[in-house]
């Protein structure tokens, strides 16, 4: 449940973005043909814009017929921060040597749409004028060759734009491209360092800035504490009233309750944290229970609410997971469900009914439920601070994906597992944290063995908004290894893929 009255500069709306639609042809066919190419390619762009599957505005560009125009268009796309990618279609034959400079310079994600204007052949009327005009079957093969020759990462979507599967795939790629755009400009604020002696939350922040674009920097938690303790009483009053309006607040935390001051302090944390992140221009952050300085509580509900408003978050200094949470928030914008930091905590191992119970100390995003969370206060046995306030809820049932990002020394590795989030078998009256229960695909034993074999992290992002296909496109755009665990996974094949990937990425990195 995101705060409906708060508008953040780090918003997740896809309306700020656009994708350029590029059509390839050549002057060989004459001006009349080029006019038809322009008209029909505009119709294709309009059809994409008319589909509810396509979340980002498609902007048609004039037909490209020579290398200079292609090169200039690529450079213009690179320079425009609102452009998150380009879609290319060769309506006629467009000699691919014209595309070499432009493709070599292009730094935005590329989708190759292999389509044509007509659905059916006009059997009785077809002549060679029709063949010259409608030869994407010919032109796109030339374009595919030069992309492969140059080693250009791209997604290829095949079919007529009236086919819902075509628009669905275009939309998936657009969402992945939006996530990439968000990461490329992401500023991430760390309060304190990583949890001591933990391995997987470490990583090369300089390499991450090179590979992903994200800028990861650290501030003293006492600078945050100063912002928290400087929150105005009137702002605290307003925010506490909002809590009582939006959530089911337990009586002891309400005005007049024995622990109302703890709720007010949680509101101070939220106000200070928001103001600090806004001043930094940060859309993601981390905290650590081992480094709380002058803060009286480990940030709990404040973190949950900031995640609900689109911020990325990682616990215990885990900046890599904060990146994933931010990307997932943007990629899932406008879709039902949510995305959150998650951690595999414990198992239900009844034979044939195995499940994973995921949670964290406090920080699970309420976007994972459509129900009204309950605001509670309970002791926290680590951190040495006052009892923290948190929202408690069960994640809604439905399909999802859990994704981890690990630093493997010579590269970053994404690992994604398709899951089914399920209802709790029984209530959990003594577990005072938000949680999710899921059945991993293809089954528990294969999933866990593959996850461990891959060296995947114990912190993840759980998304119930987007599926595996969005993360596959994201990894392709990011040129980052992705290992998928789903219905088709076997350990034998998974181990082979790990070995192949080790050879491929080491060779590719050295070329």
From Swiss-Prot:
Its cofactor is Mn(2+). PANTHER family: L-ARABINOSE ISOMERASE. Mn(2+) binds at residues 316, 343, 360, 459. InterPro entries: Ara_Isoase_C (IPR024664), AraA_central (IPR055390), AraA_N (IPR055389), AraA_N_sf (IPR038583), Fuc/Ara_isomerase_C (IPR004216), Fucose_isomerase_N/cen_sf (IPR009015), Lara_isomerase (IPR003762). This is L-arabinose isomerase. The gene is araA. Keywords: Arabinose catabolism, Carbohydrate metabolism, Isomerase, Manganese, Metal-binding. Binds 1 Mn(2+) ion per subunit.
């Amino acid at each position: 449940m995101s705060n409906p009255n708060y508008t953040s500069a780090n918003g997740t709306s896809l309306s700020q973005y656009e994708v350029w639609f590029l059509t390839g042809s050549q002057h060989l066919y004459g001006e009349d043909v080029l006019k038809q190419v322009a008209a029909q390619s505009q119709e294709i762009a309009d059809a994409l814009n008319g589909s509810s599957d396509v979340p980002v505005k498609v902007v048609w560009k004039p037909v490209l017929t020579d290398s200079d125009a292609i090169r200039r268009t690529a450079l213009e796309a690179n320079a425009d921060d609102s452009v998150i990618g380009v879609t290319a279609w060769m309506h006629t034959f467009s000699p691919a040597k014209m595309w070499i400079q432009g493709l070599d310079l292009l730094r935005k994600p590329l989708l190759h749409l292999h389509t044509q204007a007509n659905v059916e052949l006009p059997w009785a009327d077809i002549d060679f004028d029709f063949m010259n005009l409608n030869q994407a079957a010919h032109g796109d093969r030339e374009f595919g060759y030069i992309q492969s020759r140059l080693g250009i990462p791209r997604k290829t979507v095949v079919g007529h734009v009236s086919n819902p599967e075509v628009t669905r795939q275009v939309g998936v790629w657009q969402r992945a491209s939006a996530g990439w755009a968000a990461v490329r400009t992401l500023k991430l604020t760390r309060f304190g360092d990583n949890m001591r002696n933990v391995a997987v939350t470490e990583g090369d922040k300089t390499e991450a800035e090179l590979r992903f674009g994200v800028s990861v920097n650290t501030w003293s938690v006492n600078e945050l504490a100063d912002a928290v303790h400087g929150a105005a009483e009137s702002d605290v009053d307003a925010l506490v009233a909002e809590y009582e309006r939006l959530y089911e607040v337990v009586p002891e935390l309400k005005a007049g309750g024995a622990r109302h001051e703890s709720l007010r302090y949680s509101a101070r944390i939220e106000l200070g944290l928001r103001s600090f992140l806004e001043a930094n221009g940060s859309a993601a952050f981390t905290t650590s229970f081992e480094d709380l300085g002058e803060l009286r509580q480990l940030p709990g509900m404040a973190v949950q609410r900031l995640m609900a408003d689109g911020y990325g978050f990682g616990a215990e200094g885990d900046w890599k997971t904060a990146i994933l949470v931010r990307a997932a928030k943007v990629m899932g914008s406008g879709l039902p469900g949510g995305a959150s930091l998650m951690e595999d905590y414990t198992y239900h191992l009844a034979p044939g009914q195995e499940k994973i119970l995921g949670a964290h100390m406090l920080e699970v995003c309420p976007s994972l439920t459509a129900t009204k969370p309950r605001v509670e206060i309970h002791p926290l046995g680590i951190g040495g601070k006052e009892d923290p306030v948190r929202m408690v809820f069960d994640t809604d049932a439905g399909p999802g994906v859990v994704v981890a990002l690990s630093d493997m020394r010579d590269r970053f590795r994404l690992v994604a597992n398709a899951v089914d989030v399920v209802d709790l078998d029984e209530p959990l009256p003594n577990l005072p944290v938000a949680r999710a229960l899921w059945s991993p695909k293809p089954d528990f034993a294969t999933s866990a063995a593959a996850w461990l074999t891959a060296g995947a992290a114990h912190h993840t992002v759980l998304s119930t908004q987007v599926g595996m296909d969005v993360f596959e496109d994201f990894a392709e755009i990011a040129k980052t290894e992705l290992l998928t665990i789903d219905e088709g996974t076997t350990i034998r094949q998974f181990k082979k893929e790990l070995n192949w990937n080790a050879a491929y990425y080491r060779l590719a990195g050295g070329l």
